[in-house]
């Protein structure tokens, strides 16, 4: 045969192969979407995978495939990731933090979404006109009531430098949960006779500048609220607060391990585990009957021994050292 004919034949075969439809995986595929890289938030994925494994689904057994993508804080990349998983399509989406969950809800109405480290559907503003959550949204969520307990601890364990306690915080104006938390804390601060100074921070790149500006206002304490930007910028925040001897309080137990004084809040690993239990139930039955977004179940009162000693804090009852 003429060599050119061999070449044309090879090209023809390749074209035929390229035109064939994608072969659906014989095992269920989970598309796990993380909005950004963070040491604390990453515990949710570990918990989610552990729950699947405890229910019999693991990549070691080759009876499930977990595709992981991280947007590294970039919204266009996050959208591309979700669109890619939908086009595959994956059997279910696991979304970690608010941005991932909202993006997934906006992009698909059919693929089941199991959210974690995210607020209630109402706080994400994804309810329909009749007040119902998306029919394909499940997983574990949280509201903001626990923040009251966390913030109210501050005046019980810390004395003001001057006459009135001054607490500083930063928040992300573009993140509904963060903005809602700031408003809630502001109302609570008024009731507790605390002066709250809140500054917007919409990108971790500005963390140094905004934190220093806050510290220049002579605050007594810093409150780290549930905010993706706070998580991503925490080491910068802590470094600046340490230099000014300003203790950090929080509602997020994972941040205590990273240097906050104490917290009453959800265990991030268990939050992911709870969402994973729902996902496993769906994978077993291929039905969503009885599933819905449910409140996170496990919260912890934890403290950082090193920070408690540094700031001479007298602990409230029922707090345990962070592990």
Placement of each model-derived feature along the sequence:
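Short hydrophobic alpha-helices and adjacent helix-cap/hinge residues
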Residues: 2-8, 19-323
